[in-house]
Amino acid sequence: MAGKSPLINLNNGVKMPALGLGVFAASAEETASAIASAISSGYRLIDTARSYNNEAQVGEGIRNSGVDRAEMFVTTKLFNCDYGYERALRAFDESLGRLGLDYVDLYLLHWPTKDWNATIQSWKAAEKILGDGRARAIGVCNFLEDQLDELIAASDVVPAVNQIELHPYFAQKPLLAKNRALGIVTEAWSPIGGAINDGDGDNHGGRKHPLTDPVITTIAEAHGRSAAQVILRWHFQNDVVAIPKSVNPERIAKNIDVFDFALSDAEMAQLDELDTGVRIGPDPRDVDTSSFAEFV
């Protein structure tokens, strides 16, 4: 079957699906099964990373899918421990080897690090990989506004994508606007979001979750959709690429079934008002080349 997701244009003319499957923290067995379910459900964007330890299963799943490689959009990422020009080039070769592919569609720097020179040198390596045709586009993850400015000032290529934590409870409106102004597509990791402290000890032990938030569930009921589908549609209408992670075949299928309904301006505004400004993941200013060593 054909891919279900609309395509968006990156700043170098490459087309990228507007929704894909993330495989963070999925085991090898879970990844293989999830890839099969996703592709059969119409996904064409798969997002992995060196630190996820499942690149091999992603590549195997794509090869076994029966879908032409040219129809797929594969993203992987350079991890912090491999930063530096030569190390980044070697790490990319290793990722390609694990994937069993000749090229990736998008190669991302996973984090900005306190060792800014290593970050810049890694980006220079990504520029070479792009120039050699082994990545169709390059980008970054978790870069803040000033970090984007510094990177661009020291580089020849403007990132095509900035993949960031973004969900209704952490909407990052200023960074989203910055990305747009620079011609950078925003991609959301953890697009559904997770539980946050809400200050009400009588409500879920002082925590709430987007999937049970009454604002979201009320909108979902009005459309006959799930809360997750409403959130993913909110991303799409904000021109944000979402990569929800799931290993459940039913949820995988539902997550991409969001392109045949629309949220009203009032509903979009209601969802926007849920922003707490509270980050669930790490602060991009506190990450170094040795951060998250337990993942590799």
UniProtKB/Swiss-Prot annotation:
SUPFAM superfamilies: NAD(P)-linked oxidoreductase (SSF51430). The keyword DNA-binding does not apply. One of its GO terms (biological process) is morphine catabolic process. The active site is at residue 52. One of its GO terms (molecular function) is morphine 6-dehydrogenase activity. It catalyses: morphine + NAD(+) = morphinone + NADH + H(+); morphine + NADP(+) = morphinone + NADPH + H(+). Disulfide bonds: none annotated. It is an enzyme of class 1 (oxidoreductase). Its EC number is 1.1.1.218. This is Morphine 6-dehydrogenase. It comes from Pseudomonas putida. The lineage of its organism: Bacteria, Pseudomonadati, Pseudomonadota, Gammaproteobacteria, Pseudomonadales. The gene is morA.
